[in-house]
Structures are given as structure tokens and as C-alpha cells.
From Swiss-Prot:
Membrane-crossing residue ranges in chain numbering: none
Family named by the database record: Belongs to the eukaryotic ATPase B chain family.
Compartment list: Mitochondrion; Mitochondrion inner membrane
Organism: Bos taurus
GO biological process: proton motive force-driven ATP synthesis
Quaternary structure and interacting proteins, as annotated: Component of the ATP synthase complex composed at least of ATP5F1A/subunit alpha, ATP5F1B/subunit beta, ATP5MC1/subunit c (homooctomer), MT-ATP6/subunit a, MT-ATP8/subunit 8, ATP5ME/subunit e, ATP5MF/subunit f, ATP5MG/subunit g, ATP5MK/subunit k, ATP5MJ/subunit j, ATP5F1C/subunit gamma, ATP5F1D/subunit delta, ATP5F1E/subunit epsilon, ATP5PF/subunit F6, ATP5PB/subunit b, ATP5PD/subunit d, ATP5PO/subunit OSCP.
Entry's Gene Ontology cellular component terms: mitochondrial inner membrane; mitochondrion; proton-transporting ATP synthase complex
Keywords: Acetylation, CF(0), Hydrogen ion transport, Ion transport, Membrane, Mitochondrion, Mitochondrion inner membrane, Transit peptide, Transport
Location, primary (coarse class): mitochondrion
Residues that bear N6-acetyllysine: K139, K154, K162, K221, K233, K244
Species classification: Eukaryota, Metazoa, Chordata, Craniata, Vertebrata
Protein name in the entry: ATP synthase peripheral stalk subunit b, mitochondrial
Length: 256
């Protein structure tokens, strides 16, 4: 629990530590020293989310697991007790009033940790989850933005790959425009030629009609000129006789 609190406090204080006057040059110098090479492209192993197990709030579990095959289950405790007694018997460590103060302080801290550690840990975990959620949201937004950029780039590449279709369409449009112009000119020529042929046909028909009229008038005039007065009288008399005969036949027929 204390490790989570320390990590959270360190993360919150990191920007201020970078700008600190005393630690800034040292940190920058260390950065210059340890980050002069090329970055490694090897995959970075994921950091553990939770710390390892400890006993008595201080001694790691790996220490006991290391001594179990050699000393048995009680070996680490016997070793610790013997080490404490050795330090006291040889007066390497002398018990003073400060020792009782330290024991009281440690006991009070242990009590605080046992009583409020879980709630403080949950609060720290909640803060970390909120920060992780914010970072995840920023990450997803960045991923979406990058994906949109990738999709746009793919669409642009697809348009570039299909630009020959555009050239083909333009080429076909130009060919169609040329074909339409050619057809229009051809139709204009056809209309002009037809008009001229119609004119010549009209002229020929008119000349033929005039020739026929002139021939008829000439023949009629010659026929009239060739008839004598005696022939005219005989023809008129014959016509009158024919009319009288026709009238008599009409009167002789019974009325139905």
C-alpha cells in the first residue's frame, strides 16, 4: 500500500522535480550520460502491476524461499532472532530511550497501516485508475486520429491509382467532341450539297416545263393557223348536227 502511495506522490511531483533548481542540472546531466546511444528496438517487458509479497512489511518472500531448502521452515526466523541477539550481546546495537521511541513509532505506524492502509490503498488505486482512464482516452483518441489519417491516405492513394480512368474519360470526351464536330460539319456539307442539287433539279424541271408549254403553244398555234375558213365552217356545222342528234336521243328516252 505504501509503495502505491509513494509511486503516486512521485508521479505527481515529477514535473516540479524537473524544474527544481537543485535537482534539475543533475537530472539533465544524468539524462545526457545515460541516453547518448541509440534507443533499443527490443520489446520492453511489462512492469508488474503489484509489488512482490513481503513479510513483516519489510522482508521479501524470496528471502524465505531461498533459505527454506537449507534451513527449513523455521530457519529464517531462527536466523533473524540469532542475529538480533548477537547484535545485542556484542553491544553492536545498544538499547537506548530512542529505541523505545522507535519501537513505539513503528508500532503506531503499523497500526495506522493496518487500520487505514486498505482505504488509503483503494483511494490511491482509484486515482491511478482515473489517470489510466484519462491516458487510455487520450490513447484511443490518438489511435482514432491516426486511423482516420491512414484511411484518408489510403483513399488518396486509391484515387491516385485510379487517375488513369480520369485520363481515359477525358480522352473519350475529347474524342466524342471531335466526333460531334465532324458529324456537324458532315451534315452541313450534306445539307449544302442537297440544297444545290435541289436547285439544279428545280431549274431542270422549270426548263422542261417551260419547254413543254412552249411546245404546246407552238403546236396549238400551228394547228390553228393550218385550219382554213371552210374547214372551220364544216367543223362548226358538224358540231351543231351532233348536238341536235344528241338532244333528240335524250328526248326519245323515257323518263324513269
Amino acid at each position: 500500500m505504501l509503495s502505491r502511495v509513494v509511486l503516486s506522490a512521485a508521479a505527481a511531483a515529477a514535473p516540479s522535480l524537473k524544474n527544481a533548481a537543485l535537482l534539475g542540472p543533475g537530472v539533465l546531466q544524468a539524462t545526457r550520460i545515460f541516453h547518448t546511444g541509440q534507443p533499443s528496438l527490443a520489446p520492453v517487458p511489462p512492469l508488474p502491476e503489484h509489488g512482490g509479497k513481503v513479510r513483516f512489511g519489510l522482508i521479501p518472500e524470496e528471502f524465505f524461499q531461498f533459505l527454506y531448502p537449507k534451513t527449513g521452515v523455521t530457519g529464517p526466523y531462527v536466523l533473524g532472532t540469532g542475529l538480533i541477539l548477537y547484535l545485542l550481546s556484542k553491544e553492536i546495537y545498544v538499547i537506548t530511550p530512542e529505541t523505545f521511541s522507535a519501537i513505539s513509532t513503528i508500532g503506531f505506524l503499523v497500526y495506522i497501516v493496518k487500520k487505514y492502509g486498505a482505504s488509503v490503498g483503494e483511494f490511491a488505486d482509484k486515482l491511478n485508475e482515473q489517470k489510466i482512464a484519462q491516458l487510455e482516452e487520450v490513447k484511443q483518441a490518438s489511435i482514432k486520429q491516426i486511423q482516420d489519417a491512414i484511411d484518408m491516405e489510403k483513399s488518396q492513394q486509391a484515387l491516385v491509382q485510379k487517375r488513369h480512368y480520369l485520363f481515359d474519360v477525358q480522352r473519350n470526351n475529347i474524342a466524342m467532341a471531335l466526333e460531334v464536330t465532324y458529324r456537324e460539319r458532315l451534315h452541313r456539307v450534306y445539307r449544302e450539297v442537297k440544297n444545290r442539287l435541289d436547285y439544279h433539279i428545280s431549274v431542270q424541271n422549270m426548263m422542261r416545263q417551260k419547254e413543254q408549254e412552249h411546245m404546246i403553244n407552238w403546236v396549238e398555234k400551228r394547228v390553228v393557223q393550218s385550219i382554213s375558213a371552210q374547214q372551220e365552217k364544216e367543223t362548226i356545222a358538224k358540231c351543231i348536227a351532233d348536238l341536235k342528234l344528241l338532244s333528240k336521243k335524250a328526248q326519245a328516252q323515257p323518263v324513269m
